[in-house]
Protein backbone atom coordinates (compact mmCIF):
# COMPACT_ATOMS: atom_id res chain seq x y z
CA UNK A 1 0.00 0.00 0.00
CA UNK A 2 1.21 3.51 -0.78
CA UNK A 3 2.25 5.87 2.01
CA UNK A 4 1.78 9.61 1.64
CA UNK A 5 4.92 11.76 1.55
CA UNK A 6 3.67 13.83 4.47
CA UNK A 7 3.34 10.67 6.57
CA UNK A 8 6.86 9.57 5.62
CA UNK A 9 8.24 12.93 6.76
CA UNK A 10 6.45 12.66 10.10
CA UNK A 11 7.78 9.13 10.66
CA UNK A 12 11.36 10.15 9.86
CA UNK A 13 11.11 13.11 12.23
CA UNK A 14 9.82 10.88 15.04
CA UNK A 15 12.64 8.41 14.41
CA UNK A 16 15.27 11.16 14.68
CA UNK A 17 13.74 12.61 17.85
CA UNK A 18 13.48 9.24 19.60
CA UNK A 19 16.93 8.03 18.60
CA UNK A 20 15.44 4.91 17.05
CA UNK A 21 17.87 2.21 15.91
CA UNK A 22 16.78 -0.08 13.05
CA UNK A 23 15.97 -3.69 13.94
CA UNK A 24 18.55 -5.85 12.15
CA UNK A 25 16.39 -8.97 12.40
CA UNK A 26 13.50 -7.20 10.69
CA UNK A 27 15.82 -5.90 7.98
CA UNK A 28 17.23 -9.38 7.45
CA UNK A 29 13.76 -10.87 7.15
CA UNK A 30 12.88 -8.32 4.52
CA UNK A 31 16.07 -8.80 2.51
CA UNK A 32 16.23 -12.59 3.09
CA UNK A 33 19.94 -12.12 3.97
CA UNK A 34 21.58 -12.27 7.39
CA UNK A 35 25.18 -11.53 6.36
CA UNK A 36 26.21 -14.16 8.91
CA UNK A 37 28.72 -16.96 8.34
CA UNK A 38 29.08 -19.79 10.84
CA UNK A 39 32.60 -20.99 11.62
CA UNK A 40 33.04 -24.30 13.46
CA UNK A 41 36.46 -25.04 14.99
CA UNK A 42 37.74 -27.92 17.16
CA UNK A 43 39.22 -25.55 19.78
CA UNK A 44 39.88 -21.83 20.01
CA UNK A 45 43.20 -22.17 21.86
CA UNK A 46 44.92 -23.70 18.83
CA UNK A 47 47.52 -21.63 16.94
CA UNK A 48 46.22 -23.08 13.67
CA UNK A 49 42.64 -22.15 14.53
CA UNK A 50 43.39 -18.60 15.64
CA UNK A 51 45.48 -17.91 12.53
CA UNK A 52 42.82 -19.42 10.29
CA UNK A 53 39.97 -17.47 11.88
CA UNK A 54 41.97 -14.25 11.56
CA UNK A 55 42.41 -14.93 7.86
CA UNK A 56 38.81 -15.81 7.07
CA UNK A 57 37.41 -12.99 9.21
CA UNK A 58 39.41 -10.40 7.27
CA UNK A 59 37.96 -11.66 3.98
CA UNK A 60 34.39 -11.97 5.25
CA UNK A 61 34.32 -8.56 6.93
CA UNK A 62 35.56 -6.97 3.73
CA UNK A 63 32.54 -8.55 2.04
CA UNK A 64 30.20 -7.14 4.70
CA UNK A 65 29.73 -10.45 6.51
CA UNK A 66 29.92 -11.24 10.23
CA UNK A 67 31.33 -14.38 11.84
CA UNK A 68 29.55 -16.61 14.36
CA UNK A 69 32.24 -18.77 15.98
CA UNK A 70 31.53 -22.14 17.62
CA UNK A 71 34.03 -24.46 19.30
CA UNK A 72 33.35 -28.21 19.39
CA UNK A 73 36.09 -28.92 21.96
CA UNK A 74 37.09 -31.75 19.60
CA UNK A 75 33.76 -33.49 20.18
CA UNK A 76 32.31 -35.16 17.08
CA UNK A 77 28.63 -34.79 17.92
CA UNK A 78 29.15 -31.04 18.43
CA UNK A 79 30.16 -30.71 14.77
CA UNK A 80 26.84 -32.23 13.74
CA UNK A 81 24.97 -30.13 16.28
CA UNK A 82 26.48 -26.82 15.18
CA UNK A 83 25.80 -27.50 11.50
CA UNK A 84 22.13 -27.89 12.45
CA UNK A 85 22.14 -24.83 14.74
CA UNK A 86 23.75 -22.61 12.11
CA UNK A 87 21.16 -23.73 9.58
CA UNK A 88 18.44 -22.73 12.05
CA UNK A 89 20.16 -19.36 12.57
CA UNK A 90 19.89 -18.79 8.80
CA UNK A 91 23.59 -18.20 8.26
CA UNK A 92 24.58 -17.76 4.63
CA UNK A 93 27.32 -20.37 4.79
CA UNK A 94 29.46 -22.49 7.10
CA UNK A 95 33.23 -22.95 7.29
CA UNK A 96 34.06 -26.16 9.13
CA UNK A 97 37.48 -26.99 10.56
CA UNK A 98 36.95 -30.74 10.83
CA UNK A 99 39.31 -33.07 12.67
CA UNK A 100 38.03 -36.10 10.77
CA UNK A 101 35.45 -36.99 8.13
CA UNK A 102 33.03 -39.87 8.62
CA UNK A 103 29.68 -40.85 7.07
CA UNK A 104 27.65 -38.95 9.67
CA UNK A 105 29.51 -35.71 9.05
CA UNK A 106 29.39 -36.12 5.28
CA UNK A 107 25.61 -36.63 5.41
CA UNK A 108 25.18 -33.59 7.69
CA UNK A 109 27.19 -31.42 5.29
CA UNK A 110 25.39 -32.71 2.20
CA UNK A 111 21.97 -32.14 3.79
CA UNK A 112 22.83 -28.60 4.92
CA UNK A 113 20.54 -25.95 3.43
CA UNK A 114 23.50 -23.57 3.17
CA UNK A 115 26.94 -24.09 1.59
CA UNK A 116 29.63 -25.73 3.73
CA UNK A 117 33.38 -25.44 3.09
CA UNK A 118 35.79 -27.84 4.79
CA UNK A 119 39.20 -26.67 5.98
CA UNK A 120 41.88 -29.17 6.98
CA UNK A 121 40.19 -32.35 5.72
CA UNK A 122 39.61 -33.39 2.11
CA UNK A 123 35.95 -33.82 1.24
CA UNK A 124 36.42 -33.53 -2.53
CA UNK A 125 35.53 -37.21 -3.05
CA UNK A 126 32.08 -36.34 -1.66
CA UNK A 127 31.84 -33.15 -3.75
CA UNK A 128 32.39 -31.03 -0.64
CA UNK A 129 34.44 -27.86 -1.30
CA UNK A 130 37.68 -28.21 0.68
CA UNK A 131 40.86 -26.34 1.56
CA UNK A 132 43.62 -28.79 2.42
CA UNK A 133 47.36 -28.85 2.93
CA UNK A 134 49.56 -31.48 1.31
CA UNK A 135 50.09 -33.36 4.56
CA UNK A 136 51.64 -36.41 2.94
CA UNK A 137 54.30 -34.24 1.34
CA UNK A 138 55.03 -32.49 4.65
CA UNK A 139 55.56 -35.88 6.28
CA UNK A 140 57.85 -36.93 3.44
CA UNK A 141 59.85 -33.70 3.68
CA UNK A 142 60.14 -34.16 7.46
CA UNK A 143 61.68 -37.57 6.92
CA UNK A 144 64.08 -36.23 4.31
CA UNK A 145 65.14 -33.40 6.61
CA UNK A 146 65.88 -35.69 9.55
CA UNK A 147 67.68 -38.22 7.36
CA UNK A 148 69.84 -35.48 5.83
CA UNK A 149 70.98 -34.64 9.37
CA UNK A 150 72.10 -38.23 9.92
CA UNK A 151 69.07 -39.69 11.76
CA UNK A 152 68.49 -43.44 11.39
CA UNK A 153 66.15 -44.36 14.25
CA UNK A 154 63.04 -42.20 14.06
CA UNK A 155 59.57 -42.11 15.56
CA UNK A 156 56.31 -40.24 14.96
CA UNK A 157 53.98 -38.73 17.57
CA UNK A 158 50.55 -37.93 16.19
CA UNK A 159 46.95 -37.52 17.28
CA UNK A 160 43.82 -39.65 17.15
CA UNK A 161 43.83 -42.08 14.22
CA UNK A 162 40.60 -40.80 12.68
CA UNK A 163 42.25 -37.45 11.92
CA UNK A 164 43.11 -38.21 8.31
CA UNK A 165 45.20 -35.10 7.63
CA UNK A 166 47.17 -34.54 10.83
CA UNK A 167 47.79 -38.14 11.84
CA UNK A 168 47.30 -40.52 8.92
CA UNK A 169 48.67 -38.49 5.99
CA UNK A 170 51.61 -36.93 7.85
CA UNK A 171 52.67 -40.27 9.30
CA UNK A 172 52.30 -42.03 5.93
CA UNK A 173 54.46 -39.43 4.19
CA UNK A 174 57.04 -39.74 6.94
CA UNK A 175 57.10 -43.54 6.71
CA UNK A 176 57.40 -43.37 2.90
CA UNK A 177 60.48 -41.18 3.20
CA UNK A 178 62.07 -43.63 5.61
CA UNK A 179 61.24 -46.63 3.40
CA UNK A 180 62.69 -44.83 0.37
CA UNK A 181 65.95 -44.59 2.31
CA UNK A 182 65.82 -48.22 3.54
CA UNK A 183 64.90 -47.16 7.07
CA UNK A 184 62.04 -48.31 9.31
CA UNK A 185 59.71 -46.18 11.43
CA UNK A 186 60.43 -47.19 15.03
CA UNK A 187 57.01 -46.26 16.42
CA UNK A 188 53.80 -44.35 15.72
CA UNK A 189 52.37 -42.95 18.96
CA UNK A 190 48.89 -41.41 19.16
CA UNK A 191 47.58 -38.85 21.64
CA UNK A 192 45.95 -35.45 21.39
CA UNK A 193 47.00 -31.95 20.34
CA UNK A 194 48.37 -30.81 23.70
CA UNK A 195 51.89 -30.18 24.96
CA UNK A 196 51.19 -32.61 27.81
CA UNK A 197 50.30 -35.39 25.38
CA UNK A 198 53.59 -34.90 23.53
CA UNK A 199 55.46 -34.96 26.82
CA UNK A 200 53.85 -38.15 28.14
CA UNK A 201 54.16 -40.08 24.88
CA UNK A 202 57.77 -39.04 24.31
CA UNK A 203 58.62 -40.00 27.89
CA UNK A 204 57.07 -43.43 27.38
CA UNK A 205 58.67 -44.19 24.02
CA UNK A 206 62.11 -42.87 24.96
CA UNK A 207 62.31 -45.70 27.50
CA UNK A 208 61.36 -48.27 24.87
CA UNK A 209 63.57 -46.93 22.05
CA UNK A 210 66.97 -46.04 23.46
CA UNK A 211 68.57 -45.62 20.01
CA UNK A 212 66.07 -42.96 18.95
CA UNK A 213 67.83 -40.06 17.22
CA UNK A 214 64.99 -38.37 15.32
CA UNK A 215 61.39 -37.47 16.20
CA UNK A 216 58.69 -36.04 13.94
CA UNK A 217 55.66 -34.60 15.76
CA UNK A 218 52.32 -33.87 14.08
CA UNK A 219 52.14 -30.39 15.64
CA UNK A 220 54.49 -27.90 17.26
CA UNK A 221 52.80 -28.20 20.65
CA UNK A 222 53.26 -31.95 20.67
CA UNK A 223 56.92 -31.38 19.75
CA UNK A 224 57.40 -28.87 22.58
CA UNK A 225 56.15 -31.48 25.05
CA UNK A 226 58.50 -34.04 23.53
CA UNK A 227 61.47 -31.67 23.94
CA UNK A 228 60.72 -31.43 27.65
CA UNK A 229 60.66 -35.23 27.98
CA UNK A 230 63.97 -35.51 26.11
CA UNK A 231 65.58 -32.98 28.45
CA UNK A 232 64.28 -34.79 31.53
CA UNK A 233 65.81 -38.00 30.19
CA UNK A 234 69.22 -36.32 30.34
CA UNK A 235 69.45 -35.94 26.55
CA UNK A 236 70.02 -32.83 24.47
CA UNK A 237 67.27 -31.95 21.94
CA UNK A 238 68.81 -30.96 18.63
CA UNK A 239 71.95 -32.96 19.37
CA UNK A 240 71.10 -36.38 20.78
CA UNK A 241 67.61 -36.39 19.29
CA UNK A 242 66.46 -34.07 16.50
CA UNK A 243 62.85 -32.91 16.80
CA UNK A 244 60.60 -31.54 14.05
CA UNK A 245 57.11 -30.04 14.41
CA UNK A 246 54.44 -28.62 12.11
CA UNK A 247 52.66 -25.26 12.22
CA UNK A 248 55.21 -22.55 13.01
CA UNK A 249 53.49 -21.93 16.35
CA UNK A 250 54.79 -18.81 18.12
CA UNK A 251 55.84 -21.07 21.02
CA UNK A 252 58.31 -22.79 18.68
CA UNK A 253 60.57 -19.74 18.70
CA UNK A 254 60.57 -19.25 22.48
CA UNK A 255 61.06 -22.82 23.71
CA UNK A 256 64.61 -23.94 24.56
CA UNK A 257 66.10 -24.98 22.25
CA UNK A 258 64.04 -23.36 19.50
CA UNK A 259 61.97 -25.86 17.54
CA UNK A 260 62.48 -26.64 13.86
CA UNK A 261 59.08 -26.54 12.20
CA UNK A 262 57.12 -26.31 8.95
CA UNK A 263 55.21 -23.07 8.29
CA UNK A 264 51.68 -24.00 7.24
CA UNK A 265 50.30 -20.49 6.50
CA UNK A 266 47.06 -21.18 8.38
CA UNK A 267 45.88 -17.61 7.80
CA UNK A 268 46.00 -18.17 4.03
CA UNK A 269 43.99 -21.36 4.43
CA UNK A 270 41.33 -19.36 6.30
CA UNK A 271 41.33 -16.67 3.62
CA UNK A 272 40.96 -19.25 0.86
CA UNK A 273 38.15 -20.98 2.75
CA UNK A 274 36.22 -17.71 2.98
CA UNK A 275 36.81 -16.94 -0.71
CA UNK A 276 35.69 -20.44 -1.70
CA UNK A 277 32.49 -20.02 0.31
Predicted feature residues:
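Central regulatory/effector-binding core of bacterial HTH transcription factors
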Residues: 61-107
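Flexible loop/hinge segments that line or gate small-molecule binding clefts
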Residues: 74, 96-141, 221, 247-259
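Interdomain hinge and pocket-entrance segments immediately C-terminal to HTH DNA-binding domains
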Residues: 22, 31-45, 63-65
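N-terminal helix-turn-helix DNA-binding module of bacterial transcription factors
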Residues: 1-35
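Flexible loop/turn connectors
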Residues: 203, 208-277
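Hinge/beta->alpha junction and helix N-cap segments in small-molecule ligand-binding domains
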Residues: 6, 41-51, 69-78, 131-141, ...
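Periplasmic-binding protein-like
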Residues: 90-98, 155-158, 189, 209-219, ...
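Short acidic capping loops at alpha-helix termini that bridge into adjacent secondary structure
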Residues: 153, 184-186, 236-242
